[in-house]
């Protein structure tokens, strides 16, 4: 029997160690039995604003059997969660990943998910339930189209200070948040890194390490003028004799001008193209320029480092809690893990495998929709259109006014409801 190369054996053992060390804390593809793992909250049921979830692949997909959960009612609150074995990311990388598709061409609503800690009554999970991490896209109007990354530290929710744009089309996208033991993070969309940095700089979790010295003052001899007047520059001879305005040589006395009645005619004046305003010497670089003065940075006496700044010690639930004006957001392939490579692989095996087919299905659905809209549009002859225009000419302004008033009222109502919901988040 041939002996195996010791180096080959070492490589196999190393690969096995890597595989074993990678841990999947929670993974949900919403296959059979998903309802036993997820608890629908009773939040907002009493005031009849709780939305229903639908188990579906959506109106277009790359695989009709690959289903997720989708919001199904407009102007509703949604809350659902699943429990997993309590997990701490101390000394580990934390990976939080999921996919979401906004089939409704979302104009105001969330597409984010949450990780929660400690014990939570899942039947009461809602907007007021404390969470550890909130991550994912949020869209509202033209101003809000970003990826939320909110971390809870010492009972306070802290928003990321960097703007991370989210996807706004009607296709599936994968959102990934990676948090490492060195307090660095990455945000990926569709397996492409969109933002990376440090918890210290990109969130206000702790006071700043360094601050400007409040007792420092700019030295009296500090010259911060970058340019100065040229001391060798002199005013040209006769410069002050150039008038600001001159008579218009093209002007002519009107034919009906009467000197006796109107007085002596004088040509109007026009701006003098040779006049350059008050003379000032030209500017030159200041040889004594020291730059803009800045107070020196000193250690912040308020800063106290926390080596476990990145740690969430009792993660136990994953959930969706959001408000939607228009329903149709579909969540799928939820993952909590300590292995970024596994997360990338899962994204490619799900979203990556089906994205082209999904795009083709979407394009076909759009084509059919446009054809149906074209069929529904009334076809009228030119004569009929002219007759109708004559009949309705007198009513156009009234109808237009009523239509505008109705539209204005609807928009005002929608804006008020949207603002109220966002205030609640």
From Swiss-Prot:
Q: Where is it localised?
A: Endoplasmic reticulum lumen
Cite the residue spans of the region called 4 X approximate repeats.
194-259
Species: Arabidopsis thaliana
Instruction: Spell out the family assignment given in the record's similarity comment.
Output: Belongs to the calreticulin family.
Stretches the record annotates as Disordered = 213-281, 348-425
Protein name listed in UniProt: Calreticulin-1
Q: Annotated motif Prevents secretion from ER: location in the chain?
A: 422-425
Domain of life the protein comes from: Eukaryota
Basic and acidic residues bias located where? 213-235, 241-255, 348-378, 399-412
Q: Which gene encodes it?
A: CRT1
Q: What is the lineage of its organism?
A: Eukaryota, Viridiplantae, Streptophyta, Embryophyta, Tracheophyta
UniProt keyword annotation of Signal present: yes
Phosphoserine is carried by which residues?
A: 381, 397
Factors inducing expression: Induced by cadmium.
Compositional bias ranges of the Acidic residues kind: 379-398
Give the positions annotated as glycosylation sites: 59, 154, 399
- Check the UniProt entry and state the signal peptide residues, or none: 1-22
Keyword Disulfide bond in the entry? The reply is yes
Instruction: Fetch the Pfam families from UniProt.
Output: Calreticulin
Residues that coordinate or bind an alpha-D-glucoside: 112, 114, 131, 138, 321
Give the chief site where it resides: endoplasmic reticulum
């Amino acid at each position: 029997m041939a002996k195996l190369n010791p180096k080959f054996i070492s490589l196999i053992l190393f690969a096995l160690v890597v595989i074993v060390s990678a841990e999947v804390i929670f993974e949900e593809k919403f296959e059979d039995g998903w309802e036993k793992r997820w608890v629908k909250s009773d939040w907002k049921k009493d005031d009849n604003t709780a939305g229903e979830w639908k188990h579906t692949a959506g109106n277009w997909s790359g695989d009709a059997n690959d289903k997720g959960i989708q919001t199904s009612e407009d102007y509703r609150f949604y809350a659902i969660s699943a429990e997993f074995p309590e997990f701490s990311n101390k000394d580990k990388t934390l990976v939080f990943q999921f996919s979401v598709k906004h089939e409704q061409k979302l104009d105001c609503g969330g597409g984010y998910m949450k990780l929660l800690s400690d014990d939570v009554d899942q039947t009461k999970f809602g907007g007021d339930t404390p969470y550890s991490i909130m991550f994912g896209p949020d869209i509202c109007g033209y101003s809000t189209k970003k990826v939320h990354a909110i971390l809870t530290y010492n009972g306070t929710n802290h928003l990321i200070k960097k703007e991370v744009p989210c996807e706004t089309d009607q296709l599936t996208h994968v959102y990934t948040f990676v948090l490492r033991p060195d307090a660095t993070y990455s945000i990926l969309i569709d397996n492409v890194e969109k933002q990376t940095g440090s918890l210290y700089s990109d969130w206000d979790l702790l006071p700043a390490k360094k601050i400007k010295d409040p007792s420092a003052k700019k030295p009296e001899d500090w010259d911060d003028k970058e340019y100065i007047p040229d001391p060798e520059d002199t005013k040209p001879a006769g410069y002050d004799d150039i008038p600001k305005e001159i008579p218009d040589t093209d002007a002519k006395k009107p034919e009906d001008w009467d000197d006796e009645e109107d007085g002596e005619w004088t040509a109007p004046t026009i701006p003098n193209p040779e006049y350059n305003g008050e003379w000032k010497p030209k500017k030159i670089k200041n040889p004594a320029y020291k730059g803009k003065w800045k107070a020196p940075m000193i250690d912040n006496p308020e800063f106290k480092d926390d080596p476990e700044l990145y740690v969430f010690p009792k993660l136990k639930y994953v959930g969706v809690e959001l408000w939607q004006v228009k329903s149709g957001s579909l969540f799928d392939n939820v993952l909590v893990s300590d292995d970024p490579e596994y997360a990338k692989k899962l994204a490619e095996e799900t979203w990556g495998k089906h994205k082209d087919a999904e795009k083709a299905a979407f394009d076909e659905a759009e084509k059919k929709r446009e054809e149906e809209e074209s069929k529904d549009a009334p076809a009228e002859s030119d004569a009929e259109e002219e007759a109708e225009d004559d009949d309705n000419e007198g009513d156009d302004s009234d109808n237009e006014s009523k239509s505008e008033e109705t539209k204005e009222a609807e928009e005002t109502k929608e804006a008020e409801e949207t603002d109220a919901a966002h205030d609640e988040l």
